[in-house]
């Protein structure tokens, strides 16, 4: 248990931030799962529609400090790479 006033305040602040971060990361997880589901079903049009939502959620989390900017860039790059692989596979076949 916290002994000082400042320690009590830090506990409250860290809990508030934890909740905010969970919401932001939850959005990223939800949209990413939707995106990957559409890719696995070869529903590329739907995947293209939801990709801006995923990228927006990732960028917002990075901007607010929930994700490091390099982590955000890596996640976005990975998603774009998967989409481009599916597109090239569909064009070649």
UniProtKB/Swiss-Prot annotation:
Protein name: Small ribosomal subunit protein bS20
SUPFAM superfamilies in the record: Ribosomal protein S20 (SSF46992)
Organism of origin: Dictyoglomus turgidum (strain DSM 6724 / Z-1310)
Gene name of the record: rpsT
Protein family according to the UniProt entry: Belongs to the bacterial ribosomal protein bS20 family.
Keyword Ribonucleoprotein: yes
GO biological process, one term: translation
Function: Binds directly to 16S ribosomal RNA.
Single annotated GO MF: structural constituent of ribosome
Lineage of the species this protein comes from: Bacteria, Pseudomonadati, Dictyoglomota, Dictyoglomia, Dictyoglomales
Gene3D superfamilies in the record: Ribosomal protein S20
């Amino acid at each position: 248990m916290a002994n000082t006033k400042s320690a009590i305040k830090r506990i409250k602040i860290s809990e508030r931030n934890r909740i905010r971060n969970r919401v932001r990361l939850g959005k990223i997880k939800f949209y990413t799962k939707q995106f990957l589901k559409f890719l696995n079903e070869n529903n590329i049009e739907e995947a293209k529609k939801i990709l801006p939502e995923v990228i927006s959620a990732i960028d917002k989390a990075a901007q607010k400090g929930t994700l490091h900017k390099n982590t955000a860039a890596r996640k976005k790059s990975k998603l774009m790479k998967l989409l481009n692989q599916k597109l090239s596979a569909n064009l070649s076949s």
